[in-house]
């Protein structure tokens, strides 16, 4: 009886996570804070608002200052999309490959910290790319590498300049 109850709770949580990226990030995503280490991803109200704007529009440009957590938000949004939508492709483009790689690293950290019942498993896992068993993937490239020309229109692009 208890085992059946646990399975039902997990199923309900999975559905809730799939339907609500804010809930998923706040409840299950961990981030690396520069001074406090591994902490829960407690989104600020402006991050939640930004996420809703990103979800409503196909094309977005964000003019921002540094250290607002927008890259971390993009990592959480990318992970959510990868987990709950099969064959999702995320292309991270930045002026330097290391900058793009940092976002992939954030996605990997968030994934690694998830409870086991949310994990799908990797097919490919390296510093520049992650591919999940459901066909979803994220790749990091530099803007100098003709990034947009070699990938089809079915990629969700995250560009950091």
Q: For each of these PLM feature ranges, what is it?
A:
Residues 2-161:
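Phosphate/NTP-binding elements of NTP-utilizing enzymes
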């Amino acid at each position: 009886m208890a085992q059946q109850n646990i399975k039902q709770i997990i199923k309900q949580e999975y559905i809730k996570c799939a339907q609500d990226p804010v809930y998923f990030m706040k409840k299950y995503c961990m981030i690396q804070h520069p001074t406090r280490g591994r902490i829960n991803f407690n989104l600020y109200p402006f991050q939640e608002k930004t996420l809703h704007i990103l979800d409503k529009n196909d094309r977005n440009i964000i003019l921002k200052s540094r250290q607002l957590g927008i890259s971390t938000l993009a990592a959480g949004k990318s992970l959510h999309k990868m987990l709950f939508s099969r064959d999702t492709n995320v292309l991270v483009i930045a002026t330097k490959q290391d900058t793009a790689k940092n976002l992939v690293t954030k996605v990997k950290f968030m994934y690694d910290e998830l409870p086991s019942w949310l994990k799908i498993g990797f097919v490919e896992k390296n510093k520049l790319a992650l591919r999940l068993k459901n066909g979803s993937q994220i790749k990091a490239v530099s803007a100098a590498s003709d990034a947009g020309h070699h990938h089809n229109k079915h990629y969700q692009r995250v560009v950091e300049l």
